[in-house]
Each structure stands twice: as structure tokens, then as C-alpha cells.
């Protein structure tokens, strides 16, 4: 598992996460550093992104707060509403925020520009 940073460029707030061993996470690692722009939905930060390579067998239903996904044209940092996330199918989870970083989510602005890179 590779450790990464997710830096919000306007505030300098940096989140730390670990990528998992999925095909999609390995594809993301090959693209680093990369930048994603998006906004806060109230339960996740959603940024447009090319999906890239992934194994459909590795997709899942639901997320855990702190998960990071890349799929369906989106890069997302999922931070809330885990209990209601069963409505979200075909989630391609590529990593998870470290606990200290999950608590920093509330400090981020509504519109974000994330630069993702190796820690």
C-alpha cells in the first residue's frame, strides 16, 4: 500500500491516505502527481477524473467514511453518510484517509483543487 498526500491547493491543507492494491489504485499511482478540481456535496468531495484501468470484480457497494474512490468519471473523497451509502453501487475504492486526515475534512472549502502525490 502506497502512502499518498491529497493537498488542497488554495488552503495548503494536506490529507494523508494509503492506496490499496486494486488495479485502479495501481493505475492512479502511475499517474501521480495529478490534480483534480471539484466541490463538496456535503458527504463527499467529488472531482471530475478519467476512470482509467480497473477490474470490475473489485468494485463494491457502499463506502466507509474516509474512503477514496476513482471511477465512473469521478475522483472522490468520501467522508460522510456511510450508513446510507448502500444506494451507491459499483464503487471503485482505491484508498482510505488516515484518521487524523479525516478529521481535517471540515476545514476544507466548498470548492477544491486537490493535488495528489506520493507522500
Question: How should each PLM-predicted stretch be described?
Answer:
Residues 12-14:
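Short, mixed charged/polar active-site loops
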Residues 2-9:
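A short beta-strand micro-motif
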Residues 17, 21-24, 29-119:
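Glycine-rich active-site loops that engage anionic ligands at enzyme catalytic sites
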Amino acid at each position: 500500500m502506497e502512502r499518498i498526500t491529497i493537498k488542497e491547493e488554495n488552503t495548503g491543507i494536506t490529507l494523508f491516505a494509503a492506496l490499496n492494491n486494486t488495479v485502479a489504485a495501481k493505475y492512479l499511482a502511475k499517474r501521480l502527481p495529478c490534480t483534480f478540481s471539484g466541490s463538496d456535496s456535503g458527504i463527499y468531495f467529488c472531482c471530475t477524473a478519467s476512470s482509467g484501468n480497473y477490474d470490475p470484480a473489485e468494485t463494491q457497494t457502499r463506502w466507509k467514511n474516509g474512503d477514496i474512490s476513482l471511477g465512473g468519471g469521478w475522483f472522490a473523497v468520501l467522508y460522510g453518510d456511510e450508513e446510507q451509502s448502500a444506494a451507491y453501487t459499483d464503487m471503485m475504492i482505491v484508498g482510505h484517509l488516515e484518521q487524523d486526515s479525516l478529521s481535517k475534512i471540515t476545514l476544507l472549502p466548498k470548492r477544491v483543487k486537490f493535488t495528489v502525490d506520493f507522500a
